[in-house]
From Swiss-Prot:
The gene is lnt. This is Apolipoprotein N-acyltransferase. Disulfide bonds: none annotated. It comes from Prochlorococcus marinus (strain MIT 9313). Pathway: Protein modification; lipoprotein biosynthesis (N-acyl transfer). InterPro entries: Apolipo_AcylTrfase (IPR004563), C-N_Hydrolase (IPR003010), C-N_Hydrolase_sf (IPR036526).
Length: 499
């Protein structure tokens, strides 16, 4: 028993390392063996917890770039402990969730699949995989989630990720859990020397068919002729963004970006999250429409928003407020005396409406402001309500390139889910165009200032995921429950007959 537990802990740790690499860099080659090790280790929930802890610590290690935090009022001696505590908290939260999932799986297995055949075991795997997939979707609507197993296929395996066109990120997570289960069961069959060749061949055939089906779903034929849209990447260091010098330079820099976009014959210019201060007024009338991140006041409450300045105007006339705020960074109320306002310069913001639909004089858009990109269901709802394209604005400074890679992976996933082009514009990057097929085109190099031009297509069709959302995944879970129930009844009847 002790050796078995030790082996499970090793499997959990190694699997967590592979999963962390897979989430950080994308690709089934990392995640599939990681999930196979999770299935093997989850007979001990503590080992499964270790898997989640290590996976998140590795994939979210960019959180340590929060240090130094002295610029938001954190005393210098506390800067490293605070940043490390946030990082460790995220790992601990993942450990609890994965541990609970493993405990639930072992409990269900004990009740329903003890001494059961392959059908019951497959039903159990379907149930646990679909529970994981639905859990990721639910967590994506909460403030404590960034990227999970569902987003780990990209950018490495766009063909298999094409299945998100029908099943979304939750479906991709479920599929990868099932691939991991297949690898684990095949490895067990190989150790016994019975049936492993058949298991391997059947699994590889299914995997090949899934890739082919996913690739076929990426085809898009309803795109309009492209429109040139400009993106401004100001590359302003966040830690000095609110200094007097930067605030003096910003209005003229923005005006210059508008002029450059106009010279490029762009239809409009997009600027990143948090650029404009409340009640901002342009130095001169805008030569073309401006969509820029910024702040605004509403009934004494400050909100982060995407602001729209029409051609010929100097102030915003339309907006959409940020709904999903960053924990500690944005929605932590100011403490007495203003000593600590949260881990950003704009602590104490209030959330806006949940809808991500922006209606303005241009083509209707589904908008994600930074952290909101992880919530695919909200963007799919906006597309169902009429959005023709997706817009993601962000400020990922001071975080390193690792976070930018994850941001683009999520952008690709959102484009595939909704069959819409996505324009990403961020302070230091990534500034890129992601086509409805999930293919990305970098507009500007990371951490450099510039104005890039994107040929944006608009789409009218509705994807399967936009139409059905999580209904297929819920149906799969119910199918698995029925399968387990029938296996239990069959086992009970056999026991009665033997008596």
């Amino acid at each position: 028993m002790g050796n078995d537990r030790s082996l499970a802990l090793v499997q959990g740790a190694v699997g967590g390392v592979l999963a962390g690499i897979g989430i950080a860099h994308g690709g089934l080659l990392w995640m599939a063996p990681a999930l196979a090790l999770l299935w093997s280790a989850c007979r001990f929930p503590v080992a499964a917890s270790l898997w989640g802890f290590v996976a998140v610590l590795l994939s979210h290690r960019w959180l340590l770039a929060l240090h130094p935090l002295t610029w938001v009022g954190v005393p210098a001696p506390l800067s490293v402990p605070v940043a490390a505590s946030i990082w460790l908290f995220c790992g601990a939260a993942a450990a609890v969730l994965v541990g609970l999932w493993a405990w639930l799986g072992t409990s269900i297995a004990h009740l329903a699949t003890r001494e059961a055949g392959i059908r019951a075991q497959l039903s159990h795997a379907l149930l646990m995989a679909s529970i994981w997939g639905l859990a990721e979707v639910l967590l994506a609507g909460s403030p404590l989630f960034w990227i999970g197993v569902g987003g780990s296929l990209l950018p490495g395996d766009r063909a298999l990720a094409g299945l998100a066109r029908w099943f979304g990120a939750g479906g991709l997570a479920t599929l990868q859990l099932l691939i991991g289960w297949w690898l684990w069961r095949t490895a067990l069959a190989w150790r016994r020397g019975v049936g492993w060749r058949r298991s391997l061949l059947v699994g590889l055939l299914c995997l090949l068919l899934a890739h082919g089906f996913g690739w076929s779903l990426l085809r898009s034929s309803d795109a309009t002729a492209p429109i040139s849209v400009a993106a401004w990447q100001p590359a302003i260091p966040t830690r000095s963004k609110f200094s007097e010098e930067q605030q003096r330079r910003l209005p003229e820099a923005l005006q210059n970006a508008l002029d450059r976009a106009d010279d490029l014959d762009a239809a409009w210019l997009v600027a990143p999250e948090g650029l404009l201060p409340p009640d901002a007024v342009l130095l001169r009338p805008a030569p073309l429409p401006l969509l820029s991140g910024g702040f605004r006041w509403l009934r004494g409450q400050q909100r982060s928003a995407l602001l729209v300045v029409d051609r010929g105007e100097r102030q915003a006339s339309a907006f959409i407020d940020k709904h999903r705020l960053v924990p500690l960074g944005e929605w932590l109320p100011a403490l007495p005396g203003g000593v600590f306002r949260g881990l950003s310069a704009v602590g104490g913001l209030q959330p806006g409406a949940a809808s991500r639909l922006l209606q303005w004089p241009g083509p209707t858009a589904a908008v994600a402001i930074c952290y909101e990109l992880s919530n695919g269901a909200a963007l799919a709802q906006a597309v169902a309500d009429g959005a023709q394209w997706l817009l993601a604005v962000a400020n990922l400074d001071p975080y390193p390139l690792a976070l930018q890679r994850q941001f683009i992976a999520l952008a690709q996933l959102r484009s595939i889910e909704t069959a819409r082009d996505l324009l990403s514009v961020a302070n230091t990057g990534p500034s890129a165009l992601v086509l409805a097929t999930g293919k990305q085109q970098q507009l500007l190099a990371p951490f450099t200032e510039g104005v890039g031009l994107a040929d944006l297509h608009f789409h009218q069709g509705i994807s399967g995921y936009t139409r059905w959302r999580e209904a297929p995944l819920i149906g799969l879970m119910l199918f698995a429950v029925v399968g387990l129930g029938l296996s239990r009844v069959r086992s009970w009847l056999i026991s009665l007959m033997l008596c």
